[in-house]
Every structure is written in structure tokens, then in C-alpha cells.
Swiss-Prot record:
Pfam family, one: Plug_translocon
Gene Ontology annotations of biological process type: intracellular protein transmembrane transport; protein targeting
NCBIfam families in the cross-refs: 3a0501s007, PRK08568.1-5
Keywords, ordered alphabetically: Cell membrane, Membrane, Protein transport, Translocation, Transmembrane, Transmembrane helix, Transport
An annotated GO cellular component: plasma membrane
Protein name: Protein translocase subunit SecY
Database matches in InterPro entries: SecY, SecY/SEC61-alpha, SecY_CS, SecY_dom_sf, Translocon_Sec61/SecY_plug_dom
Known role: The central subunit of the protein translocation channel SecYEG. Consists of two halves formed by TMs 1-5 and 6-10. These two domains form a lateral gate at the front which open onto the bilayer between TMs 2 and 7, and are clamped together by SecE at the back. The channel is closed by both a pore ring composed of hydrophobic SecY resides and a short helix (helix 2A) on the extracellular side of the membrane which forms a plug. The plug probably moves laterally to allow the channel to open. The ring and the pore may move independently.
Ranges per topology, Extracellular: 48-59, 135-146, 198-229, 299-332, 415-417
HAMAP family reported in the protein's UniProt record: SecY
Transmembrane segments: 21-47, 60-88, 110-134, 147-171, 179-197, 230-251, 277-298, 333-352, 396-414, 418-432
Annotated membrane topology: Multi-pass membrane protein
Family: Belongs to the SecY/SEC61-alpha family.
Amino acid sequence: MGVIDVLAAVGERFPAVRKPERKPTLYRRLAWTGVILVLYFIMSNIPLYGIPPQNIGGQVDLQRIIFASSAGTLMELGIGPIVTASLIIQVLVGAKIIKLDLADPEGRRKFTSAQKVLALAFAALEAVAFTVGGRYWVGTAIEPGPLDYALVSLQLFLGALLVIYFDEVMQKGWGIGSAISLFILAGVAQGVVWSIFGTIPGVAQDYGLVPAIISNPDLTLLARPNGFPDLTGFFTTLAAIILLVYLQAMRVEIPITSERFKGIRSRVPLQFIYVTNIPILLVGILVSDLLLVQRLLADYLGVESRAYQIYSSIVYYLSPPRGVVQSIADPVKTAVFIASWTVLSIVFGYMWVEIAGLNPREQAERLIKGGLAIPGMRSDPRVLERVLRRYIYPLTFLSSLIVAALVIVADIFGAYGTGTGLLLAVGIINQYYAMITRERALETYPLLRRILGEEVV
């Protein structure tokens, strides 16, 4: 029995959300999705009991977007545990370290159960690390005791547990999509709306763009200091969204023919953004984790220690700048940010293609198994692999570079919701549009539903 089997066996002992006996209607699934979204926003506004009020907030935008989290609340850990668990298992499966066929229902069942156990383990670990590491008591005269640690850790763990079950509700078919995608989209949308209309009472009444225009309509709105939303960021946001929608619609088509039905020809469309948002997402997760560790080290080592200062300097240069003013004020940071994110995005892009089974060899094997071949060439995996290699690796490099460049430019010019957030949000909206369109088609034409073997509650 392997590790995945042990984790799956443990996971099956936990309470689970039952799958609907028959597929719910689209409106019912939308209603469930709306309920989950409302619960997410409620949890994002319930502060943790037992921590100093002044230590609620202060979260870096990148962390808030990547993990759909809200500092000092029940959503402090956000989707971090479940995303980390999922990525680890997918990487191990893709690297063939763990043998698991995700195309097989039994393999998917094991994956889901193992992911739940691993996510709960990460939730418990992060909850303890946040509290014992002094995350909520840094800079205060309060000396927390064991009861304080236990109380806050329990709240963090319960918040993460609810997120895991929210995702299970969605994944089992009660809602549409996944809770992970839904929460990321909600967080990005909230950030964009806040940048346009937000105010911070007693600190910055004119924080958002609209309040700033009303209070002080002059040329300073083109570029504001301290990372405040400005007109440059607003127009950058619009341009980034339009460009992302266009790029995600682009395809590179490879001509194919059917071996079973001679004379039938078609094309296999490869997304121009072949690696989608995965490389830049992995870069964002890496930098977010480094920022998280920085906060924990501040308590253990002290902000004056040499080791902490070296570490915080590295994290500072890897973190995205907050708008045009900061980018110009610190050109060295901007240059390091551009170089590091570009290189890491390309490296992660190639890694993901190999790990996720998107490389030429595995794609060729899939086409051969499907009875497909390229016109004028032998139906040989090695021949097909050589042809696909001319498409896939250049697409991997180019798409990783383009995605990184778009996110970097968006961050430098202060796009609302961050460049990474906009990239994720546009991709998620595209997925939701496709899912809802499909569901509406199935409800409009019941015959399609019967062909697919689906029933309505």
C-alpha cells in the first residue's frame, strides 16, 4: 500500500459531502454557488477572537489574491492549505513518483480523499505556525499564553476546514466550478471595486480613485504615491483585461486525420497561452510563501538581526512594486522584479508542461490512442512527437514569457487587483462562461442530456 492509498483510506473516514442523486438544474447550482460566495464574504469579515485589533489587516495584496485570504479573520488561511495539497499531489503524480491514473474514477476518488487529508494537515500546521510564530502579537506588549495560542489556532483551523468543505460542495456537483476559483475571483473583484470606490476612515478618505477625483481632481491622479489607485492603474487594468481576453481566445491549430474513418480531416487546437496561468501562479505562490515566512521570522529572529534583514531584502526585491511611483523611485527593485519573475515563469512553464503531461511525447501518445494522425505521416508516436515538439516547446516558452510580461507590466503600472489577480480572474471568468453556456445548452436541448446520461432533480 502506497502513501496515496494510506492518505485516501484516512480521508474516507472523514465526513464527506454526498453527491446529488441526479444533477441539479442550472438555477439550483447557481443558488448554491451564491450561498457559498456569501458565506465566504461573511467569514472574510469575522475577526479572530483573542488577537489585538491593531494587528488585524496589513496583508500584502499578492497574498490576499493568491490565497483568497483576509488577514485577521476566519479566512486568514484562505485556500492556501487546499491549493498547496493539490499542487503537491499533482506534481508527485506528474513526476511519476506516485502512480495514480486521474482519468480513472477510482484514481480520482483516491486523489480527492488524499487531498482532503493533506489539506487538513497543512491547515493545522499553518494555524499553529501563525500563532506560535507570533503573527498576531508582533509589536504589542501583550504576552500570549497557551490558551491564546490554542484559541486562535482552533479558529484558523476551523476556517480552513469550512473552506475545504465549501470546495467539496462545489466539486460534488451542487455548485458550478470550484470554491477555489470562486474565492479567487471574488477576491480580485473585491480588490478592483475597493481600488475604485474605497475609503479608509481616519487614514485616507480619498484612497479609491473615485473619492480622489471628487476631492482633488488634478494631474496628481495620473500617478499617486504609496501604492494608492490612480488613473494610470485604471487604464492599465482595462488594457490588461482586453489583452488577456484576446490572448486566451487565440489558438494554434495542428492538422490531423482519422485512422479509423479515412478521409475525415480536422484540426487540433492548442491554446496560444499553452501553459495558461500556471507558471505565474506558481511564482506568485512562491513569493507569497516567502512573505509569510518573513512575518514568522520577524518574531523568532527579531527585525534587527542580520539574518532577518538579508532575508527581508531578498523578499523585498522579489515582491511586485506598487505602482508607477514606487517603480521609478526604486529602479533596482523594479529591474530585479522583472528579471526574477520572467526567469521563474519560463522555468515553471517548462516544468509544468513536463509534470502535467502536456509534453510532446504524452500528447502524441494520446493522439495515437484516439486513432488520430498527421496527414502525410506515419502513425508512429515518435514521428508525431517530433512534429508536436516544433509546436509545443516554442508555445511553452512564448506563452510563459508573454504571461510574465503582461503581469509584470500590469504591476509596474499599478493595475487594480494586481497583474496576477487579473490573469487569474479573466481565466476563471472564461471557464465559468464555458460551463454556464454548456449547462444552458443541456437544459435547452434535453436530448443532449439524455445522450450524456444526465438527469435533472
